[in-house]
Amino acid sequence: VALAINFGRLMDFRPVCGYSGVKDKFKDYNHPEEDGVFLIDMKTGKSKLIVSYDQIWNVTKENSFTEDQKITVNHITFNKNGTRFVMLVRNFPSKGERWRTAIVTANTDGSDLYCLSGYTYVSHYSWKDDEYLLFYMDGPYGKQLYLVSDKSSFIKPVDPDFFLEDGHCSYSPDGEWILYDSYPDTENYRNLYIYNIRKRK
């Protein structure tokens, strides 16, 4: 199976991630009941809506905004064994403002929807295993790389002295190393890092 979203809607939100030429028929709806996350059977090609944008808004809206927001899923990924998935949900920002991101997880069939974080600063992420995820996000220690547990309030900075800037993150197959990069520096180079979790260096 595979997960899919409305890439026309994503194109309107963030062209670098969306598909051009695909129109969003729900463009005028902030969080439609007929659109959201779809599950695709890769053998038959059939798809079905498993989580609607209206459902997502209802689990993320509390204490986040004073007004109704138009939202979209920007990133979505299965955990290691495919039993749950995570999605980054973002609002369409007003002119001159930056979008904010909520973290939501669910079972593969769309059940057991859980809001890990309300709308705040959240960037790159990676599943560690079937329960834990890495997120570069705004948390108790400011913007840091955090280890977060699905369906709980557990959040812990990985190494506040090392992960000072946002970057793509991924674990080695044995779970002992983190591969990390950076945004381009002044000479347009991206730095690549490997970090040993046990040795903390």
List each model region and its residues.
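Short, conserved, GDST-rich strand-edge loop motifs in beta-rich repeat architectures
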Residues: 4-34, 88-99, 183-188
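Alpha-helix-centered segments that form part of catalytic cores
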Residues: 30-55, 69-77
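Flexible internal linker/loop segments at domain or repeat junctions
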Residues: 134-163, 171, 194-195, 199
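Beta-propeller blade signature
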Residues: 32-45, 100-109, 147-150, 193-199
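C-terminal hydrophobic structural anchor segments
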Residues: 178-201
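Beta-propeller fold detector
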Residues: 48-55, 114-118, 155-160, 201
